[in-house]
Amino acid sequence: MKVVEAICEIMKREGIETLLAYPVNHIIEYAARTDIRPIIVRQERVGLHMADAISRLSSGKSIGAFAMQHGPGTENAYGGIAQAYGESVPILVLPAGYA
């Protein structure tokens, strides 16, 4: 089993049904294989706020998950990460890229 497969299996066991993602991230393909619905966004900040909304609307019962590229993609997402952290909103952020 590859690490990315293990991550997706753990996400599924934790009840994550949707993975918001900005390409390129290998987790997107493996999440789809694990029956986690990938939704592709056009900008990192938007995806992070969507993950934040999933957690807020479910009162934390469903954790919003967001995957993005490493480097500049992560920097674009910092505003949303800081807001979620400051307001104690549970989100899962998975920065990755080409291996």
Residue spans of the language-model regions?
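N-terminal alpha/beta PP-like core and its mobile active-site loop of ThDP/TPP-dependent enzymes
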Residues: 1-99
